[in-house]
Structure formats: C-alpha cells, structure tokens
A protein has these predicted regions:
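N-terminal beta-strand motif that seeds the catalytic metal site of vicinal oxygen chelate
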Residues: 1-20, 68-71, 121-145
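Core segments of cupin and vicinal oxygen chelate
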Residues: 2, 9-53, 100-103
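Vicinal oxygen chelate
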Residues: 5-13, 61-86, 105-110
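Conserved active-site tyrosine of GNAT-family acetyltransferases
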Residues: 18-22, 85, 114
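Active-site beta-strand termini and strand-to-loop segments that position acidic
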Residues: 45-50, 109-112, 122
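Residue-level recognition of short loop/turn positions
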Residues: 89, 112-113
C-alpha cells in the first residue's frame, strides 16, 4: 500500500494518569520527548520492538474539548494530499507545519463524515535514511536463509 498509517496520537486530560493506564494495561513504553516547536508537552509511545509489526505514537495534553484520537497517514507531499482532501469534500483543520527540525511535517483534515485524520510527510533527511534501512533489512533477511 502506498500510504500506510504510521503514527497515532492519544489526547489526555491527565497525561500522567493516561501514561500509567497504557503502561499498566498494554506494557507500552512512554517517555517525554523534547518538542522545540511550540513548547508542546509530548510523550513518545512505543508499542512494539524494532522489526515487529505495528506502529508507535504519541500521548499529549488534550488541547481542545472533544479532541479525538488521531491516526496519521504517510504521504510524499502533504500539499498534494490536502488538495485531494478538499477536492473530494473534506476540509483542512491544520495546514502543513514542521514538527521539529529534521522530523518532517504534519497536517490535519476532516473527511466528509467529520472524522479527523492526520497526514505525515517525512523530512528530506528521513527520506534519505529509508533506502539505507531497507537495504539493511534485506541484508539481514538474506543472512538468515
């Protein structure tokens, strides 16, 4: 599939309480991450070990009443996909913005059913790393045979 879901975000009224809940229920590792853009208090959520199926995400203070759980879809160009969103009846909630230097960009939209979804565009640095990671995985798989 060309555009997989690659990240989730869980908003919480009480981040410490939510952190304890998800760690105790699922055994997820949750730790605070520095976020230079906007000073947002953000926690990385690791749900799997490297090489295992699944996605990781984030936990943060709810910044608006009713803020829902959000999934982020990986795309090559946020601007292109926001154009597709609006052309097909969706609306842009948050235009493209950089997460932090070297971390890529995100945007948020609502679909025709008022569901909120996010878009994630890797940074140029991350795009350069991707082929190297694929080559490394292929080499490991070849050694196992």
């Amino acid at each position: 599939m060309p555009n997989p879901i690659v990240h989730f975000e869980i908003p919480a009224d009480d981040v410490t309480r939510a952190q304890t809940f998800y760690q105790n229920v699922f055994g997820w590792k949750i730790k605070q991450m520095p976020m230079p853009a906007g000073g947002l208090e953000y926690y990385g959520v690791t749900t799997r070990k490297d090489g295992e199926a699944g996605i990781n995400g984030g936990l943060m203070k709810r910044n608006m009443p009713g803020q829902p759980f959000a999934n982020y879809v990986a795309v090559k160009s946020i601007d292109d996909f926001l154009g597709k969103v609006t052309a097909n009846g969706g609306s842009v909630i948050m235009p493209r913005q950089e997460i932090a230097p070297g971390m890529g960009s995100i945007a948020v939209f609502k679909d025709t059913e008022e569901n909120m979804m996010g878009l994630y565009q890797p940074s140029k640095q991350e795009m350069k790393k991707a082929p190297a990671k694929k080559a490394k995985k292929a080499k490991k798989a070849k050694k196992r045979r």
